[in-house]
Amino acid sequence: MNAARTGYRVFSANSTAACTELAKRITERLGAELGKSVVYQETNGETRVEIKESVRGQDIFIIQTIPRDVNTAVMELLIMAYALKTACARNIIGVIPYFPYSKQSKMRKRGSIVCKLLASMLAKAGLTHIITMDLHQKEIQGFFCFPVDNLRASPFLLQYIQEEIPNYRNAVIVAKSPDAAKRAQSYAERLRLGLAVIHGEAQCTELDMDDGRHSPPMVKNATVHPGLELPLMMAKEKPPITVVGDVGGRIAIIVDDIIDDVESFVAAAETLKERGAYKIYVMATHGILSAEAPRLIEESPIDEVVVTNTVPHELQKLQCPKIKTVDISLILSEAIRRIHNGESMAYLFRNITVDD
């Protein structure tokens, strides 16, 4: 199709190879051309964006992947959205496969809910809609004053399991922590496999029960209202590491939404190996892999790490052959087509469960 006639354009919000590659895959599936723009850093460190064609009255889709430099990527997206708004684009839709700061969506001690701040900034910059994938918390959608389509990668990962893992019927789906149990259960039910949960010291410590905002004064200076006796709480203590479920002689498939702490996945894999699992896979939507991740994965009992291309990880993939990529440009391009044409998005959620 001809993008100029249909009234929409697709732009890449930065010039990194990964973002440009994803944008090109999407435009090829749509039969459109990538919008002409220039995004670069000034010598003083400022980000500059120049739109090189008319966008007046068109639907504009901005593709932005999030590399290691998160803050620069956010500024690129904000400045490009504002430039398109100034150029009289009709609608500005951000295609952000991995939404940054999604782990800061709850109050922690004397911190802030940064994810809500970012949502407000995007709206102020001119975005009118967002397409993203597997938000860390579904409640994040409520931070926005415009529509958010939270697509899911589970159908692609389930297909990978069925087609690329030999003898997957002998596998068991594993939750790395009780927090991930619902997601793991959803995978296990659709694949008709068993379920195991790792509980104990290897679990994620994202929920911090010690909230510093309620720190009491020193006992000698404290004044207690007469008759007020607060119940005493037992100190939080992790139990010894335990695997709930049988993984002996089985293939263990650990599923989660984000891999950003490789050490915890390696620890989980070592535990599963000790319990008798003969092959271990790790699967997640977003692979936020550090510079040390390839070495840690290569030296671990993990046989394969499978992630989608929502986050750039080509360099890490070259360093570690265990890292595999699942392309999700198909669902992103279909979402763009449906939104532009005013079609229902229900088809994209037909195989999705509430726990995905």
Curated annotation (Swiss-Prot):
GO terms for cellular component: cytoplasm; protein-containing complex; ribose phosphate diphosphokinase complex. SUPFAM superfamilies: PRTase-like. GO terms for molecular function: enzyme regulator activity; identical protein binding; kinase binding; magnesium ion binding. Keywords: Acetylation, Nucleotide biosynthesis, Phosphoprotein. SMART domains: Pribosyltran_N. GO terms for biological process: 5-phosphoribose 1-diphosphate biosynthetic process; purine nucleotide biosynthetic process. Coiled coil: none annotated. The modification N-acetylmethionine is found at M1. Pfam families: Pribosyl_synth, Pribosyltran_N. Ubiquitous. InterPro entries: Pribosyltran_N (IPR029099), PRibTrfase_dom (IPR000836), PRTase-like (IPR029057), Rib-P_diPkinase (IPR005946). The keyword Transport does not apply. The modification Phosphoserine is found at S177, S215. It comes from the Eukaryota. Transmembrane segments: none annotated. Belongs to the ribose-phosphate pyrophosphokinase family. Seems to play a negative regulatory role in 5-phosphoribose 1-diphosphate synthesis. Binds to PRPS1 and PRPS2. This is Phosphoribosyl pyrophosphate synthase-associated protein 1. It comes from Rattus norvegicus (Rat).
